[in-house]
């Protein structure tokens, strides 16, 4: 194999240079795309009046919108903000939500940090590999042979680098579920013997196209255990790749900004790329976030290309040599057709997946809906880039219950109409109490309030100087214009099914506090932030459609012995160390589960559980660790099973097919393969509690 030289030094968060290059195109080592001069949270805090002082004075607070002309009162008043975070999702004068005070916590013995080349689970738990990269799932697909790979074979096999996972019920087939998986990116160094990154072959590129995308696989559970395995050639099984057909829908579909020489309609797209996390909808579909799509394109020429991190020269992967659509000098709009949330109906293998333009275009990490009291979906989303933004979408349509054809057809339109918002956060502590070290302010919490700034509703833009189509296609620029708060890489965003609170994983930001970059603020309280934090957000009056919210930091990650860490006030002597929170999920008891990406503490990545309410709130426990070089992705927490995607095992600088850094999952002498793993309790009881 020819070395990838020159290698950039290891990622400041702990990830290898090999991972950085193939997953996100070395985004952390390039100039931050957000160079807008909108206010940083620190600037806002410097002028903010302490909310506690205002409340003590019984004054009325008005919060200006980005344009400075409108004010939010009523639900955005301090009383609503305080009530939103008081107790557990309570409303003024109303009881807490059922079961919120009866949290059970997590009662397993935590796994110690380690560097073992295996999946390590707690005592009393068992595991199995559900499916590996390359296993056949479609009729006619051959068994995997790393030395006989073809694009045709890969298009019928489980894809590479599994990320987001979802398990959906399958009526009428006992013990079976439908598993949907993202395949975020390929690492050809670990896929092909003798791979030359400067001169990939057409065959290698076409195999990589087929290894991207999504997989739908029916899985069967083994009687009396938690084991899962694929049902090969099931009629619902499906592969979607970088060359499959997708349809643009919503208010920007058909826009001139989405048209190319191959698609004069602006509605038909080939492929989905860099699908990271996602979500499962209440109406039985799955959502998939297109994240670091910029790395696949060459020769960016416009300011919009630059704002999305697209380079001005050849791409790392060299795909433009084999398909002109990846050369923006020839097809300047092709990149605009990526960076969306994809909706897939896993129960209809003949359906065309849809890219939902109403949810905006940016580096989507995930998209997890919740329903309002009247049945409208609200989707929370993070843009995974340093100093980028937090968003939500509120649908104007109500979900129809049931599984009739009419209900399903209607529900497949829910994410095409509504209002797209971006968040602006304000801290409530004096600016001199936020010093960049992570030291808590005098009130004992990093907290504050915020507003949701509307960007567009249908074909109406709320951003001066931008049309609605421009808002949807260039959503980052819209956020810049209205002064959204720049965050530390907002990734997965999930609402709790028990309390309604929303949890935002902010993975890290090594640039915070550097010369010419914004320093610490109350929502992002550490300079050179290696370990990240988790923000807890409560919509005013528990209303997901509210234009205001209260927030506080639930966790400030790192070594518990570090005074700059915080675990919701729980004694730090009793918690596990954690670094770089990425994906989050909930169990039925309201416990939050966190997977990590790029452990800067030196041990392997893992999955962690933590109670979000009750007496054990903040008690973080490590549930598992993954093998050498791997990332923990896509956690699914069922009552009696945990599912995780073990992504890029063995992805260590200098590793290759010939010189593997890991022997997982099949032992020495076998090629390293990203895989899905199931974990269960040996006694058959509920996970964790």
PLM regions: where:
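N-terminal export signals
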Residues: 47, 53-76
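Long, well-ordered hydrophobic secondary-structure segments characteristic of membrane-embedded
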Residues: 103-282, 287-294, 304, 310-345, ...
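Blade-edge beta-strand/turn elements of extracellular beta-propeller
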Residues: 116-132, 140-153, 224-266, 344-361, ...
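Blade-level signature of beta-propeller repeat domains, shared across WD40, Kelch, NHL, RCC1
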Residues: 639-689
């Amino acid at each position: 194999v020819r070395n990838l030289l020159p290698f950039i030094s290891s990622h400041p968060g702990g990830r290898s240079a090999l991972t950085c290059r193939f997953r996100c195109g070395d985004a952390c080592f390039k100039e931050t795309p957000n160079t807008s001069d909108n206010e940083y949270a620190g600037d806002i805090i410097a002028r903010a009046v302490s909310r506690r002082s205002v409340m003590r004075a019984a004054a009325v607070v008005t919060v200006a919108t980005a344009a400075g002309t409108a004010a939010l009162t009523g639900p955005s008043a301090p009383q609503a903000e305080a009530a939103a975070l008081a107790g557990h999702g309570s409303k003024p004068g109303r009881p807490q939500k059922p079961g919120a005070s009866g949290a059970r916590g997590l009662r397993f013995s935590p796994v110690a940090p380690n560097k073992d080349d295996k999946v390590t689970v707690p005592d009393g738990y068992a595991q199995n590999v559900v499916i590996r990269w390359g296993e056949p799932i479609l009729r006619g697909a051959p068994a995997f042979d790393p030395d006989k790979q073809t694009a045709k074979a890969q298009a019928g096999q489980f894809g590479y680098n599994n990320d987001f996972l979802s398990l959906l019920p399958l009526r009428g087939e006992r013990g079976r579920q439908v598993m949907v998986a993202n395949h975020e990116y390929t690492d050809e160094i670990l896929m092909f013997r003798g791979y030359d990154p400067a001169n990939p072959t057409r065959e290698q590129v076409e195999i990589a196209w087929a290894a991207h995308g999504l997989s739908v696989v029916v899985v069967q559970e083994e009687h009396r255990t938690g084991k899962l395995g694929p049902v090969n050639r099931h009629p619902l099984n499906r592969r979607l790749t970088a060359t499959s057909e997708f349809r643009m829908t919503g208010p920007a579909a058909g826009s001139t900004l989405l048209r190319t020489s191959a698609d004069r309609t602006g509605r038909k797209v080939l492929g989905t790329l860099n699908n990271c996390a996602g979500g499962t909808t209440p109406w039985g579909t799955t959502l998939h976030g297109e994240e670091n799509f910029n790395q696949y394109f060459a020769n960016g020429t416009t300011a919009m290309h630059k704002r999305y991190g697209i380079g001005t020269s050849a791409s790392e992967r060299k795909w433009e040599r084999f398909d002109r659509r990846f050369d923006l000098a020839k097809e300047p709009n092709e990149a605009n057709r990526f960076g969306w949330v994809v909706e897939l109906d896993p129960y209809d293998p003949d359906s065309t997946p849809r890219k939902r333009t109403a949810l905006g275009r940016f580096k989507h990490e995930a998209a997890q809906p919740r329903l309002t009291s009247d049945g409208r979906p609200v989707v929370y989303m993070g843009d995974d880039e340093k100093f980028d933004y937090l968003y939500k979408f509120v649908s104007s349509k109500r979900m129809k219950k049931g599984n009739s054809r009419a209900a399903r057809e209607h529900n497949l339109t829910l994410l095409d109409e509504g209002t797209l918002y971006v968040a602006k956060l304000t801290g409530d502590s004096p600016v001199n109490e936020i010093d960049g070290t992570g030291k808590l302010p005098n009130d004992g919490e990093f907290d504050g309030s915020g507003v949701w700034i509307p960007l567009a509703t249908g074909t109406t833009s709320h951003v001066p100087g931008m049309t609605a189509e421009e808002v949807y296609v260039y959503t980052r620029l819209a956020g810049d214009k209205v002064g959204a708060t720049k965050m530390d890489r907002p990734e997965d965003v999930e609402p709790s099914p028990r309390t309604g609170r929303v949890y935002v994983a902010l993975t890290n930001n090594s640039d915070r506090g550097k010369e010419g970059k914004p320093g610490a603020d109350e929502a992002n309280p550490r300079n050179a932030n290696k370990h990240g934090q988790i923000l807890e957000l409560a919509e005013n009056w528990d209303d997901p459609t509210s234009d205001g919210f209260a927030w506080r930091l639930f966790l400030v990650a790192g070594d518990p012995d570090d005074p700059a860490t915080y675990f919701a006030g729980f004694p730090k002597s009793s918690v596990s160390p954690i670094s770089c929170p990425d994906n989050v999920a909930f169990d039925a008891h309201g416990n939050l589960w966190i997977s990590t990406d790029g452990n800067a503490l030196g041990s392997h990545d893992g999955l962690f559980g933590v109670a979000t309410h009750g007496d054990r709130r903040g008690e973080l426990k490590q549930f598992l660790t993954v093998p050498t070089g791997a990332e923990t992705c896509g956690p699914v927490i069922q009552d009696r099973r945990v599912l995780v995607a073990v992504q890029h095992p063995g992805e260590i600088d200098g590793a290759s097919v010939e010189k593997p850094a890991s022997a997982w999952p099949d032992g020495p002498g076998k090629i390293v393969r990203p895989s899905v793993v199931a974990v269960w309790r040996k006694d058959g009881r509920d996970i964790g509690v």
